[in-house]
Amino acid sequence: MIEKLRKRKILVSIIIVLFLVALIFLINVLLGNKDKVKTEGIDLSYRVYTEDGYSDWYKNGEESENKKSILGIEIKINTKTEGHIIYNVYGDKETFEDNDSYDGEIAGNKKDKLYGIKIGLTDDLYKKYDIYYRTYNKKDKWLDYTTNYSVSGDNGVNIEKIQIKVIEIDSDFNHKNEKASIGF
């Protein structure tokens, strides 16, 4: 009788362990696919300028790791698809710059803090891809993603970090943009 109970306990324990392993696997698969989006054929990189100088280059989807206010940004895109990346920043002069920056040009004067940014794609890039981006500041933390030349930032609160992703239009990228910009 005792031997039978012992075998039953072992069997129940094995079943519970197998169930937990299967559950963990299922959760990892579901959560792991959350941000699996199509980015083939795109090489996006960007770096920011702070009072410490230029950061390292960040790749598609990486968060910039700087801890100081962003004073300038360069964004490059390398692809066989026809088109350019364009971007503009909102700084201390309380307006966006007069001219957009393109394909690796510096946006921002490297002296004034940036409060907002808008990023877009042109030509066939615009037809095939969306560009998502979000900014971080001490007051609001990470703002929601915005896309395709909409403003990200909080007017009057300097941007400290940025994250940029180029994603094929038919990808399943879950984002919300209820609070992507404040005061613009």
Where are these regions (language model features)?
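N-terminal Sec-pathway targeting helices
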Residues: 2-19
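Residue-level detector of intrinsically disordered/flexible regions characterized by low predicted structural confidence
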Residues: 9-11, 30, 78, 167
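Lectin-type carbohydrate-recognition ectodomains
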Residues: 35-184
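Generic short N-terminal amphipathic or hydrophobic helices
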Residues: 1, 9, 23-26, 166
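Sec-dependent signal peptide cleavage junction
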Residues: 23-40
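Short, flexible coil/linker elements and helix-boundary hinge sites characteristic
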Residues: 7-9, 32, 53
